[in-house]
Amino acid sequence: MPKQLYFNEDARRALKRGVDIVADAVKTTLGPRGRNVSIDKKFGAPTVTHDGVTVAKEIELKDPFENMGARLLVEVATKTNDVVGDGTTTATVLAQSIVNEGLKMVAAGANPMLIKRGLDKAVEAVVAELKSVAIPVRDRADIAHVAAISAADSEIGDLIAEVMEKVGKDGVITVEESKGIAFEKEYTEGMQIDRGYISPYFVTNPERMEAELEDPYILITDKKISSIQDILPVLEKALQVTKNLVIIAEDVDGEALATLVVNKLRGTINALAVKAPGFGDRRKAMLQDIAILTGGTLISEEIGRKLDSATVEDLGRARRVVSDKDNTTIIEGRGDERAIRARIEQIRAQIETTTSDFDREKLQERLAKLAGGVAVLKVGAATEPELKEKKHRVEDALSTARSAVEEGIVPGGGVALLNAIPALDRVQVTYEDEKYGVQILRRALEEPMRQLARNAGEDGAVIIDTVRRLQKEKNDKNIGYNVLTGEFGSMIEMGIIDPVKVTRSAVQNAVSIAGLLLTTEALIADIPEEKPATPTPGGGGMDF
C-alpha cells in the first residue's frame, strides 16, 4: 500500500486542524451554561449529550492527517475519562491551548524537545500546588455538592451521596436502566457471589426458593467433589459442632451431591453446596477472599492440603448465608479484622498497578465485596434518549464523587488552575527554550475559566481580570465567577468545587498528549483508494 507523507510545519499544521475541530465541538459543552451536542445515529433517535468524551469519540475526519490530530485529542479525553470519569472537556480545552501556543513557539524557531521538557517541569509544579491546597471531603453534603456539579442536577447529587454513605468509599455502585421514570436504589449486604445452589433440594424457604442457613460453618476448596469419601472426614467432624454446613467448591456432583441431598432430606445435616465463583486464577483469588472474610482456610492441593485433611478449624464462619438459583450472599463473615484489612490493602495495591481496565474493574468488585458494600442505582426517564443521557450523567457524577473522596477538592470554575499559575514562577529551567514550555502552560491554565465565561456569553479576559482583582482585594483565593448566577464570590461557599484528582488528571493528560504533538516532525498515512463508481444497471428491455 503506497503512503503519503507530511513533514515539519505542514505536518504540525495538519495535526492542529484536527485538534481544533475536535476541541471546538467539545468545548461548547464546558460548564453549567455549556450547550448540548446532538450526535446522529444510523438507527433510532440521535444521542443528545453534554459529555465531552462522548462527543470526542464520535468524531472521525476524512483527511487522514487531520484525523491523526483529532485521534490524539480524543486520547486526552478518553484517558481522563478512564482514570476519573470527568474533566474530559477541561482536559480538551487545556490541550488545545497548549498545542496552539506551542506551535507558535516552534514556528518562531524554539526547540520543541526543550519546550516539552519545560512543560513537564511546569506540570509537576502545578500538580504539587493542587495537592497542597486540597480540602478533604468529610461529609455527605460535600459529596452531594461534587456529584451535583458533575451531573448538573442536585437530585442526582443527593442520591449518589446517600448511596456512597451506605456502601462506603470502597463499595461497588453499579448504574443500570430502570423500567420506570424515577430513580431506584437497591442494596446488597455482605459478600455476594454470582453462583447459586447446585441443587434445588437445598432450598429451605420454598416461597422465595432460597436456601437460608443461620450461623453455618463453611468449607472452601478449589477441588471438584464427586466422591463422598473426599469430604466424609470433615463432615463427621463438623457434625459434632453444627448441622449447618456450606460447601463452596469447583463443583459438587455424583455420589457426593446425592449423599448431601439425601441427608438434608432426612434432617441429618442442613447442607448447602455452591459452585465457586469466577474462573482460573481469579477463582482462586476469590476463594481466598471468602476464606479470609469467614476466617476459614482455602483447601487446595496447590498449597499441599487435601480435602480429607480438613478439620473444623479450617472451616469458615458467618452469621448467615442465603442462596438462590443465581447468587449466594455471605452475611457478617467471622474473619479476623486485621486479616481482612490486610487483604483489602493488597487488592488496593493491585488496582493501582494494573494496566488493564477489565482487571481493574474485577479487582474493584472484589474490594467492595470484602468491604461489604454493593449497591445498584437504577435510572429512569420518560424517553430513551433522555434515559441514556441521564444514565451517562449519573456515571460521570459517581466517578467524580469517588475522586473527591480519594484526593480532596479545590475551588471549581477554573479557579484552582488560575491559582496554580504563581507556582510556575518557582520552576527551575536549564535551557532558555524550556521557559517557553512554562509560559505555554501559564497561558493554558487560564483557558478553562475563559471558556466557561465564553459559554455563558461573557468576555473571558474581563472575567479573569475581575477574579484576580477581587482575590487580591479580599485576600481570598477561593473567589471566582459563578456562570449560572453571574456573581463573583467564594466558590467553596457557593458549592462550586472540583475534585483534585479530576483537575490534576486533566492537566497531566493534556500536557502529555500536547507534548507528543508538538514534537512530531513527520506524518505517514495510506493514500486513499479511489473506488470506481458502480455502473448503472440496464433497463433489461422492459417498456414502462
UniProtKB/Swiss-Prot annotation:
Q: What is its EC number?
A: 5.6.1.7
Q: Where in the cell is it found?
A: Cytoplasm
- Provide the binding site for ATP: 29-32, 86-90, 413, 482-484, 498
Cytoplasm: present as a keyword of the record? yes
Here the disulfide bonds are none
What's its catalytic activity? Answer: ATP + H2O + a folded polypeptide = ADP + phosphate + an unfolded polypeptide
Q: Which UniProt keywords apply?
A: ATP-binding, Chaperone, Cytoplasm, Isomerase, Nucleotide-binding
* EC class (word): isomerase
Q: Listed GO molecular functions?
A: ATP binding; ATP-dependent protein folding chaperone; isomerase activity; unfolded protein binding
Any one biological process term the GO annotation gives: protein refolding
Cellular compartments per GO CC: cytoplasm
Q: Does the keyword Ubl conjugation apply?
A: no
- CDD domains in alphabetical order: GroEL
Q: What's the family?
A: Belongs to the chaperonin (HSP60) family.
Its quaternary organisation is: Forms a cylinder of 14 subunits composed of two heptameric rings stacked back-to-back. Interacts with the co-chaperonin GroES.
Q: What does this protein do?
A: Together with its co-chaperonin GroES, plays an essential role in assisting protein folding. The GroEL-GroES system forms a nano-cage that allows encapsulation of the non-native substrate proteins and provides a physical environment optimized to promote and accelerate protein folding.
Record NCBIfam families: GroEL, PRK00013.1, PRK12849.1, PRK12850.1, PRK12851.1
Record protein name field: Chaperonin GroEL 2
Species this chain originates from: Roseiflexus sp. (strain RS-1)
